[in-house]
From Swiss-Prot:
Name of the protein in its database record: Activator of 90 kDa heat shock protein ATPase homolog
UniProt keyword annotations, A-Z: Chaperone, Cytoplasm
Oligomeric form and interacting partners: Interacts with hspD/HSP90.
Pfam family for this entry, one: Aha1_N
GO molecular function list: ATPase activator activity; protein-folding chaperone binding
Highest classification ranks of the organism: Eukaryota, Amoebozoa, Evosea, Eumycetozoa, Dictyostelia
Organism: Dictyostelium discoideum
Gene: ahsa
């Protein structure tokens, strides 16, 4: 065996500066969070949502973006994984305006000092100019994720201004209507624009080329079909009809994991609503009965419980909310012990649309299994 530094250079693998991941075939990961912060800032910072003669409604601060965002290239395809939380301040500034003063109090008829609606010099009373007033608060977008990238995200808002008088209270009521009718839709629209820009910026060049080539091939095929002359069929012509081979439209996912806990504890993580909320950190619902419905990550994952065998097996129908209507997969989760102080968790999911397979697989690993192990310390070894 050669000593260190004496090996044949022809057999040494180097990390070269001029090396290339040809056609994006090998797995590569790019951190998109800095780009995301800059892009989201440009979409929101100081943007005017609505302006009238009466008020200006705008974003008043640079958005604060936290979370993670990566673009993973594998075999020429780009897989985006992101979970972002965005917060920003807003304000509605009511412009100064002229208002007529309240009418004077009318004294009894015939009084010597009756007050007319005009000043002592006979001129009408001057209008009063109101002061500029500002109502402010915060927008929060708690969950921009690849799980619900095709949907408008949830947007929450708070109002920081206190209604200390009737006039301010009236202004706040008006602002609440503005937030619902213009503020929330604006934030949702800008978030969806961010997703489009993200995919446009980081999608692999190979994937774009393949898409363009496919479009060109389709155009060529259509042109050829239009110009070709259909041959005449005579009595001596024999036609053989062959049944075209159908490509599969779904795939089956199989995952195995080891949890350092009992089968009942492992089972409970998937059916206990409090534990589901703990590791997903999101809105969840779960009817713990056969035939009961469930949803995770604010409805991004939906399904129905078919079989619930405590400590043994769970069978569910399962779908992502962006799948076509009527498309469902089936998930079977089994729990077993194999002589070690741990539980074997095996997940088999059938009927996954091919285009959604990699996203579904990564979602199970990253958003469910890894989170369970980290939240409940089920990955720690027992000696």
């Amino acid at each position: 065996m050669a000593k260190v530094g004496e090996g044949d250079p022809r057999w040494i693998v180097e990390n070269r500066e001029d090396g290339h991941n040809v056609n994006g075939w090998h797995w590569s990961e790019k951190d998109c969070l800095p780009w995301s912060k800059n892009t989201i800032g440009g979409l929101f910072d100081k943007k005017v949502i609505q302006e009238t003669d009466e008020y200006t409604f705008k974003i008043s601060s640079t958005p604060v973006v936290s979370g993670e965002c990566t673009a993973n290239n594998r075999k020429g395809k780009t897989i985006f994984l992101y979970e972002l939380d965005v917060k920003m301040n807003w304000e509605v500034v009511f412009k100064p305006k002229k208002v007529l003063p309240p009418p004077p109090t009318t004294k009894s008829k015939g009084a010597a000092d009756d007050i007319d609606e005009e000043d002592d010099d006979g001129k009408p009373a001057e209008p009063i100019i109101t002061q500029k007033k500002t109502i402010s608060g915060e927008f929060t977008v708690p969950y921009i994720s690849d799980e619900n990238g095709d949907e408008a995200p949830t947007v929450r808002y708070t109002i920081n201004t206190t209604a200390d008088n009737d006039e301010t209270k009236q202004s706040i009521n008006m602002v609440q209507s503005l937030l619902k009718s213009h503020g929330v839709p604006f934030v949702q629209s800008q978030c969806q624009e961010f997703i489009k820009l993200l995919k446009k910026e980081f999608v692999s060049k190979k994937q774009v080329e393949q898409s363009q080539q496919q479009q060109t091939a389709n155009t060529t095929t259509n042109t050829t079909t239009t110009t070709n002359t259909v041959p005449k069929v005579t009595s001596s012509t024999v036609i053989f009809n062959s049944t075209p081979t159908k490509k599969p439209t779904t795939k089956t996912l199989k995952l195995k994991e080891e949890f350092q806990c009992s089968p009942m504890d492992a089972y409970d993580v998937f059916v206990n609503i409090n534990k589901l909320r703990a590791f997903t950190q999101s809105d969840c619902t779960f009817e713990n009965e056969e035939g009961g419905k469930f949803s995770l990550y604010g409805g991004s994952i939906q399904g129905v419980n078919k079989t619930l065998s405590p400590g043994s097996k769970i069978v569910q129908t399962w779908r992502l909310d962006n799948w076509s209507k009527g498309v469902e997969s089936q998930v079977t989760i089994t729990f077993s012990v194999d002589g070690k102080p741990l539980t074997n968790v095996e997940i088999v999911q059938t009927g996954i649309p091919i285009d959604e397979f990699e996203k579904t697989e990564e979602g199970w690993k990253r958003n469910i299994l890894d989170r369970i192990k980290h939240t409940f310390s089920y990955s720690s070894k027992i000696f």
